[in-house]
Amino acid sequence: MHLLRLSCWAALALTLTWPVASAANSPTKPSGIASAAPCGELVATLPNVRRELCESAQLVPVARSVRGRLIYARDIVPTQPGLRVLVVGAIHGDELSSAAVALHWIRLAGQPPADTPQSIHWRFVPVLNPDGVLARPPTRVNASGVDLNRNFPTPNWQRDARIYWEKRTSRDPRRWPGPQPLSEPESRFLHEQMRSFNPQLIVSIHAPYGVLDFDGPSVPPSRLGRLYLDQVGIFPGSLGNYGGVHKGVPVVTVELPNSLRTPLDAEMRQMWFDLLRWATERLGPVATGGRTP
């Protein structure tokens, strides 16, 4: 009986433990933090998020922000994982609905539909920019004033990112790309996750343009729920440009229609099921070397 109990705990530890950014690129993974620790602040800040939903997400601390706030994540691993999918919310801190939708999707990922084969290893980072989310008022940029979605190391970043910021945005402080690529702990953490987790699909949740964007190989989804494909172009230092165009990893960018309100629960479910079916049909064979999962 004692050995059985030890085996159960070992299995649980393996489920919740996964590679994090190395010490050279990201703060050391915090330890001894209860999984429900962020829920008080998140429930008070995010739309359509109740404590029960947040606590059921079983978030695990994995990194720290500029101000030392914890960045949390959750892995959901099937019995026979094939496709690896990284889902990221709140890269921009004032897009509160993006974090809320990520939390709702964690619940749905743990309750897969019986008619859809499940061989997907999900990794969720619902709030990449906690300093921006928890600022009063929330801010697009992180605590250093950097737009994290312009801070990834796309080719010719040193030249193009600054020119784009100066010429195309008129030095908009909300879109400052930072002093150099990966200058921020939040972008370094996500960059390291792209290396260590090696996702075959990245889903980046934003707001408020109400469209579906796509970068990279494969045939993009035509719609997720009521969001239809409308490829808006790429920007120096963006996750879509870096991941989809430069690294060849499909990046689906979900642009919710409102930053402060989530879609209705039924709509979030439909978006999720559409994403799940598209990923299984279009990307499943890629993850299994050309074999149907």
Residue ranges of predicted features:
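Bacterial N-terminal signal peptides
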Residues: 7-17
